[in-house]
């Protein structure tokens, strides 16, 4: 994908706090189910903002940095998801979301970002992303020194 959307750590916190506002009142939730790995950071932020202490993971592998591949469920939580926020960083093609809906039909599936192909599969999200755009997450990047333009 030629187009990129960069999310900084500050943006991730801001977007996830906006998502938390959509999930009030906090007392309705038994816990948070983070989709590993993309949902881990948003889950920590949601846990803080909603004062939720019970956090579990569902581990689904479908990407190698910037390439989608076959989906594998590595670890799953028991139950149908009732009373749980299921959080991932992004809904893209919707393949992971479909799997999560099958596994946890009573959970509230939310993402920080959503692309058009998967948007109808989530209950809440914050940022619209064009389908042809790759998202660079803060945990995949580092701040580095760049020479001034005049030195090139």
UniProtKB/Swiss-Prot annotation:
Pathway the protein acts in: Purine metabolism; GMP biosynthesis via salvage pathway; GMP from guanine: step 1/1; Purine metabolism; XMP biosynthesis via salvage pathway; XMP from xanthine: step 1/1
CDD domains: PRTases_typeI
EC main group: transferase
GO cellular component: cytosol; plasma membrane
Annotated binding of xanthine, by residue: 92, 135
Annotated compartments: Cell inner membrane
Keywords for the protein's UniProt record, in alphabetical order: Cell inner membrane, Cell membrane, Glycosyltransferase, Magnesium, Membrane, Metal-binding, Purine salvage, Transferase
Binding site residues for GMP: 69, 92-96, 134-135
GO biological process per UniProt: GMP salvage; IMP salvage; purine ribonucleoside salvage; XMP salvage
Molecular function via GO: guanine phosphoribosyltransferase activity; hypoxanthine phosphoribosyltransferase activity; magnesium ion binding; xanthine phosphoribosyltransferase activity
Catalytic activity of the protein: GMP + diphosphate = guanine + 5-phospho-alpha-D-ribose 1-diphosphate; XMP + diphosphate = xanthine + 5-phospho-alpha-D-ribose 1-diphosphate; IMP + diphosphate = hypoxanthine + 5-phospho-alpha-D-ribose 1-diphosphate
Membrane topology, record value: Peripheral membrane protein
Record bears the keyword Metal-binding: yes
SUPFAM superfamilies: PRTase-like (SSF53271)
The protein's required cofactors: Mg(2+)
Binding site for guanine: 92, 135
Assembly: Homotetramer.
NCBIfam families: PRK09177.1
Name of the molecule in the record: Xanthine-guanine phosphoribosyltransferase
């Amino acid at each position: 994908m030629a187009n990129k959307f960069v999310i900084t750590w500050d943006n991730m916190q801001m977007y996830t706090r906006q998502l938390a506002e959509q999930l009030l009142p906090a007392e309705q939730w038994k816990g948070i189910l983070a989709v590993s790995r993309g949902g881990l950071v948003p889950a920590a932020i949601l846990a803080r903002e909603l004062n939720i202490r019970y956090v579990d993971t569902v581990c689904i592998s479908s990407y190698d940095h910037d390439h989608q591949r076959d989906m594998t469920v590595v670890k799953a939580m028991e139950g149908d998801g009732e009373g749980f926020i299921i959080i991932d960083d992004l809904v893209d093609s919707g393949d992971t979301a479909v799997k999560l809906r099958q596994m946890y039909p009573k959970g509230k599936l939310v993402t920080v970002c959503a692309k058009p192909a998967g948007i109808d599969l989530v209950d809440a999200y914050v940022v619209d992303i064009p389908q042809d755009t790759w998202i660079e997450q803060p945990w995949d990047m580092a701040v580095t020194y760049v020479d001034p333009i005049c030195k090139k």
